Amino acid sequence: AADFVPGDILTEDIVPNPVGPYGESKIKAEEYILSHPAADKQVYILRPCMIHGPGNKGNLNLLYGVVKKGVPWPLGAFENHRCFTSIDNLCFVIKGLLVKEVESGIYNMCDDEALSTNGLITVICKALGKKARIWYLPKGLMNGMAKVGDGLHLPLNSERLTKLTEDYVVSNAKIKKALGIDKMPIRAEEGLTQTIKSFTNTK
């Protein structure tokens, strides 16, 4: 729910700073649940990063479509990193919470490795059997084009450029410690490859 993340890595201890009604409503829901505890029940609030799996219909699917058409990624100079959540890892965690004695609380949920957008595009291309087309255009040029987009209301503007290039790295250390594990069962690249291959099987 925290669209703006102060610092390098988001942990459960960082006070959320949601931007917009979507994030704000999620925090309000968390506050309500935590303010009405049940004496005989455990309460878990999971904060997953972008969840993906076979049949995914979100932004990952859109990026896949762009890459499949051979459109170059022009923001290669921005080496950002973002965390994702494989549906297999999410199901593993939920099962663990159901069968183990885990303390109530808020838990971040994500795969162990953060990937750059360049890395994500490389994973998509590898699944497609294609060579990644990544352009490393100067950051100054892209920032300038985004400013022009602000004034002319073009698809690429400063806000969208920030969204496309910002970091969103999350710690899953708390949930792994609670479940008594050292790592998630599915690596980030493995899970993303499974998701991407599900797209190739349905197109």
Feature locations, PLM:
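Conserved C-terminal active-site "lid" loop/helix of NAD(P)H-dependent oxidoreductases
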Residues: I87, T122, M145-D182
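Catalytic helix-loop patch of NAD(P)-dependent Rossmann-fold dehydrogenases
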Residues: P6-H52, N56, P72-L75
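Substrate-positioning beta->alpha
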Residues: K28, N56-L62, G76-L98, S104-G105, ...
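Residue-level signal for the nucleotide or nucleotide-sugar donor/cofactor binding architecture
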Residues: G20, R82-D88, L115, V170, ...
